[in-house]
Regions:
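Short active-site segment of divalent metal-dependent hydrolases/proteases
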Residues: 109, 113-114
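An acidic/histidine-cluster motif and surrounding catalytic segment
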Residues: 1-103, 116-160
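Beta-strand elements within well-structured catalytic alpha/beta cores of enzymes
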Residues: 104-108
């Protein structure tokens, strides 16, 4: 069984079950992993800006950061961590006219794909990632129109 832990670091208003389902939907649709763990941390802009500065050299908050992990042999496979800046995501949802729950689900789907090795650094890889993302969003009843909001953010996985 795959476990998704959601850490709501400031008791933001979130639908924890929907966030877990977003990650599990990606894993199921891609038949990626049947067993393992990952964490989704919902935090503030300052915490994400600090991580963005330390791991990407970008001195600004962003919507979501992905930190893939390598598991030790014999351990339960650990996919990695997602860190979402709730205030940033909320402002982005309001600016784009999307529901916050849908926006957070999109960020979990997008971040989980990064944990699985997907990226959008070339047109070909972006097309592959966006197709997988769209498939998961449709399964979650998230409107596809929400995806262009990602074009404005800087949310690639950190290096290092």
């Amino acid at each position: 069984m795959f476990e998704v832990e959601v850490l709501n670091e400031a008791e933001f208003e979130i639908d924890e079950a929907r966030l877990k389902m977003a990650a599990l939907t990606v894993l199921a649709r891609l038949r990626a992993q049947d067993e393992g763990e990952m964490t989704v941390a919902i935090t503030d802009n300052d915490a994400v800006a600090d991580l963005n500065r330390r791991f990407r050299g970008v001195d600004a908050p962003t919507d979501v950061l992905s930190f893939p992990m390598d598991s030790m042999p014999g351990d339960v496979p650990y996919l990695g961590d997602l860190v979402i800046a709730y205030p940033y995501a909320k402002a982005q949802a309001e600016r784009e006219g999307h529901g916050l729950s849908d926006s957070l689900a999109l960020l979990v789907v997008h971040g989980t794909l990064h944990l699985l090795g997907y990226d959008h650094d070339t047109p070909e890889r972006k097309a592959e990632m966006w197709a997988a993302q769209e498939s998961a969003l449709i399964a979650l009843d998230v409107p596809i129109e929400i995806v262009p909001a990602l074009e404005d953010g800087v949310h690639d996985e950190p290096q290092g």
